[in-house]
Amino acid sequence: MSKSIDILYSSPFPSTRTGALFNAFSYPTKISPEAEAIFIACHSNIGDTILDPFGGSGTTGIATMLTDSPTESMLKKVKELGLEPIWGPRKAVVYELSPVGCLLGRAMCSTKSVIFKKYTETLLKVTSDICNEVYSIVDPEGNIGLLRHAIWSDIVVCPHCGMEIPYAQLAVQDNPLTFKEDSLCPHCGESVHLADAERVKETVNDPLLHREISVKKRRLYKLYGITGKKRWSRYATENDQTSYNSTMANRDITSSPIYPIKWGELYRQGYHYGITHLHHFYTSRNWFVFNTLWSQISQYPEDIRDALKIFLLSYNSAHSTLMTRVVAKKNNPDFVITGAQPGVLYISGLPVEKNILFGLQRKLKTFVEAFEKIESSKGEVQFVNGSSTNVLLEDNSVDYVFTDPPFGDFIPYSEINQLNEAWMGIVTDDAEEAIINPAQGKAI
């Protein structure tokens, strides 16, 4: 064991942020479970108890399972490095303050891939039958297709003539595709510095709060769809916006959670204008679709519900909200669609609305592969949703501690995680959160 430990610390350990176990669920500061498993196998023996008092997304639990079920890449890596790990089952106890982090770890370490695949495919089929109508859209040839994603645009006002203009019309330059900092108003011809251009506000009726609210005015800008096997894109028209408004009017969202956002260090007055509750982070279409998915979970066996929840939440804050973005890459003729910017709650002037059902269908394979990697392991993992200030373990019962301690003021986990935890009905108790955070009144 001492030889392996010497090798492990002689140089930076090679690790990749790839693979099904890593990619199944995005989480701030997440590390490779395969790399951690090698450390555990080199520092402990079969049957030992591993403790992680700051569990995050449950990586230590997954890594402990992997010590009894090492992947081909792990076996290859230890051979290359000349390590002598002791493979075999161990036990892990993982404490995590975040409900979603704890749920994630527990589901990843206890779900059978075949059962998960069966019920997830049913969930997606049932929800598609209900929701595909809201993603239906007319293609450039006049046929009915399905939306893949839509780019929305803030509406700004010209500081010179007072006319309203789509932000995209001013900011986007084609051939090559780039974003401009300054542009000419199409109405008066004066120069507009986009960073200073005032966003237009509008008053709308909030169907969940049952009152009028003031929000940033946004309109559909560009649509990307598929008809049969043919992919296409086109700019949105007034008819598209009218059709969207009509389609989403009076949709049943009575089962939706009504959760007031607990703002802290991440709040920005500009791009968060009008966002007071969870549903304000979504278009009305994606709120309806995600709520429909979530409400279906209670109809499935209890022992698969946690996995279904984690599956949906893996796509939620990263890809289902207005935080989804476009970027312009050199020599690329069109926008590149990406997910939410990690570690913040940023909403751009060109937010993207993805087809949630398409996205989850693609993600299904990743989850199945992740479960397959550890489902044969005889390791045991206990997840405790609570503070590590109160670890209920007997003295001398822990053989090895592997942990990723708090990051000071780097990431306000509880503020970020509430977008997922609100759907669960339980959010992180930030009174116990170890963090430097003026909004919480916490310092060194």
Where are these regions (language model features)?
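Short glycine-rich, flexible loops that bind phosphorylated cofactors or substrates
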Residues: 410
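Hydrophobic beta-strand segment of the Class I
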Residues: 401-402
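Nucleic-acid modification enzymes, centered on SAM-dependent nucleic-acid methyltransferases
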Residues: 2-53, 61-394, 413-441
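Conserved SAM/SAH-binding loop
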Residues: 57
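A short glycine-rich, Lys/Arg-flanked "PGG" loop and its adjoining helix->strand segment in the class I
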Residues: 444
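Conserved SAM-binding loop
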Residues: 406
